[in-house]
Amino acid sequence: MEKIEGDFSTFWRFDILPPINRLSWWWWWVLVLVPDPNHPERSRQLMVLWSSKETPAIRVSGHWWIPKSRMLVDEDGGTVMSGMVCAWWYDGESMFEPLLMKECRMAALDDNHPLWPEEATEKGQGAGAVIPLTSEDLSFGLRPGRKSFWLNLSSDENQVAKGAPKNFSVTMNPWWERPSTAKYKNNVFGLNMGYDIQRVHGMKATLNLDGEEIEGSAYIQKVGVQAPSIPWFWGMLHFDDGSYLDWFMPHVSPSFTMKDDTPWSVRDFFRSPNAGSGLFHDASRNRTENFKRCTVELERQEGEGSLRDEQGNLLPRFKVKVWNGRTQISIHVRATSRARWVFDQPTRAGFVSHLTYNEYPLEVEKIAILDEQGLRSVDDYEWIRGNAEHAWGILN
C-alpha cells in the first residue's frame, strides 16, 4: 500500500457545523503503541491530543482554560484557534500524565491553502497539518501525496525530571488497505447537534524516543462533537497480522451524576446500553465485520497480581463481546495503567457540569474469535496491543 486512502478533504477543518456554545468540541487524537521489552504482554503507549472547544471557560485536570478568541477560518479554509496540546506516556511501568498540557494558538491548513509549501507536489489530495504556534515543534500532519503522517512532541520539563523521555517523533505509514483507509461518519440530530468523525484505524508506526527507534502501530482520529457528552465505553486492539478490532458502548447510568475522578463509585452500579457497536478488520479473512450488538462488563482486578493506578486505585478488567450473524468475538482484557482527564465546565445558574475521561493501556488475557471457518485464540497471534476508555459524568 503506497499511500493512505480515503477522503481527507475536511480532515484539517472544523467548520463543518455551526458552533454551539459549551457543546462544540473539536480534536485530533493520536495513539501510538509500541512493544514493552520488560513486559511483552503489555505495550508502551503515547497519546497526543490537539483540541479546542466553544466555551467561555473549562477546567482541565485542575487547569482553567479560558479561550482568548473564537475559531477563525480564512477564505481559503485555513483555521486559527485557541486550544491545548495534551499528552501522556506510559512506559510499561509508570504513567506520565500529563506528559504535556500546553495552552497555545494553533493553525491548521491543507494542501490547497496558499501557505502550504510551494515545493510540495501532489496538491489537493488531503495533505495538511495542525501547527501549534509555540517555540517547540508540537506539529501533527499528513505529508504530500498522503504517503505518511508525522507527529512531533516535546515533554514538559517536570515530567522529564521524573524520568519521561524528552522528545518524541513519530512517522506513521500505511499498513494494509482496510485499517489504513480513512473512515468517515457524520450525523446531525437536529438544532445543529451531532458529530463529525474521521478515523484511520491502523498504521505502522516508527517512534523515535530520544534517538531510539521503535517499531509499532498507531491509531488516528479527528472528531467534532456538538452534543452533551454522556458515559461511554470504547476500546481498540491492534494485532500483529494487521487486524483491528474496536467496540463502543455509550450508556445511560447513574454515573452521569458523578462529580469527581474516583473510580468504583456506587453510582456506577447500573448501565443501560445505548446502541453498542463494533468493527473488526480481519486480516486473515481479508474482510471487515461490522457489529451492531455489543456488551461490556466491568470488574475490579482482585487477588495476587492485580494492578493499581498511580493514585492507588484498583484497575479494571473489561469483558467485551461483539457479534453478528457470522462472527462472534469475546475478549477479556485488563488495564495495566490509567490516564485520566477531568473536565469541569460552568453552565447556567452557577451549576458546573463534569466529565471524567479515563484511558487504559491494556493487556489481553483471553480472546475467542469464532466464525464459519473455526475458532481463533490469543495463541494464534504473536502480539495484541490495545487501549480502552471509560467515561462518566455529563458535560453540557
For each of these PLM feature ranges, what is it?
Residues 1-396:
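Structured soluble/peripheral alpha/beta segments that form catalytic or ligand/cofactor-binding pockets
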